[in-house]
């Protein structure tokens, strides 16, 4: 067992103690049934929204997946340049602004200022090019200031640490204590905490993915990870729709 694993285990135990988590073993089915019916009862109560998944802001998607639910690990795959980051930031913005959730965004590709500009652009309905050039009309300045005021009141946290590992993300989230949604952009830029896998990228990605799924369950939150898809699907005859095998 390496030092990173020991540190991660120790931090997890401290985190569990702070939350008063009772580490149970086997649990009889009748107890789980009672808990399940209790959850269903809460879902039908007047304040049911707090027990439902975090809304993405896309009605059709929310109706299909019932929002982003606790312990879910969601892998969002698309080819380069298809708008993965914009899509994920829209989810983050909606969760923070409309649902008043705490959102942590780990960006391994873009810096914090770039992410902030994108969030402001979307909230203010001002083109991203104008934010890059600074050539803004007076009404656009007004909308940007209003957007900045709205976003400043949210609990969106940005981290642009390059080549971050799963244990490092977990450590930062534990220090944050209260977090409702984690977004990672993107999976292939993360580093493995296990040196034994160095040089074997397939094993590294597999270990990182498994670690993120475990993290979602341990912290009891949804984790949305973006992933690049290989361009091989474009070369396939007939159906160009991406498949699981296109995850690289």
Question: What are these model-predicted stretches?
Answer:
Residues 1-70, 126, 140-155, 167, ...:
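Core recognition of P-loop NTPase motor domains used across DNA-transaction enzymes
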Residues 50, 128-138, 156-162, 192-206, ...:
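Flexible beta-alpha connector loops of hexameric P-loop NTPases
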Residues 63, 94-178, 192:
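Cytosolic-facing regulatory segments adjacent to core modules
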Residues 74-75, 104:
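Short hydrophobic/aromatic beta-strand immediately N-terminal to the Walker A/P-loop
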Residues 78:
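The Walker A (P-loop) glycine that initiates the GxxxxGKT/S ATP-binding motif of P-loop NTPases
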Residues 81:
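Walker A (P-loop) phosphate-binding loop of P-loop NTPases
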Residues 84:
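Conserved lysine of the Walker
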Residues 203-248:
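Phosphate-binding/switch region of NTP-binding enzymes
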């Amino acid at each position: 067992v390496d030092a990173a694993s020991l540190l991660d285990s120790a931090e997890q135990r401290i985190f569990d103690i702070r939350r008063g988590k009772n580490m149970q073993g086997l649990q009889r089915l009748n107890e789980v049934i009672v808990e399940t019916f209790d959850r269903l009862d809460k879902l039908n109560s007047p304040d049911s929204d707090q027990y439902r998944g975090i809304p993405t802001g896309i009605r059709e998607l929310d109706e299909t997946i019932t929002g982003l639910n606790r312990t879910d690990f969601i892998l969002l795959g698309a080819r380069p340049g298809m708008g993965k980051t914009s899509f994920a930031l829209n989810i983050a913005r909606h969760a923070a602004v409309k649902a008043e959730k705490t959102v942590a965004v780990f960006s391994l590709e873009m810096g914090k200022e770039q992410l902030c500009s994108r969030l402001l652009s979307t909230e203010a309905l001002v083109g991203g090019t104008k934010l890059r050039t600074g050539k803004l009309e007076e009404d656009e300045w007004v909308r940007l200031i209003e957007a900045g005021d709205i976003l400043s009141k949210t609990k969106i946290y940005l981290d642009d640490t390059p080549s971050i590992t799963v244990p490092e993300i977990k450590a930062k989230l534990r220090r944050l204590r209260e977090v409702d949604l984690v977004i990672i952009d993107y999976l292939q830029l993360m580093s493995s905490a296990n040196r034994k896998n160095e040089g074997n990228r397939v094993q590294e990605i597999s270990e990182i993915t498994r670690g993120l799924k475990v993290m979602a369950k341990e912290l009891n939150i949804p984790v949305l990870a973006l992933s690049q898809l290989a361009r091989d699907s474009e070369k396939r005859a007939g159906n160009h729709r991406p498949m699981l095998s296109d995850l690289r």
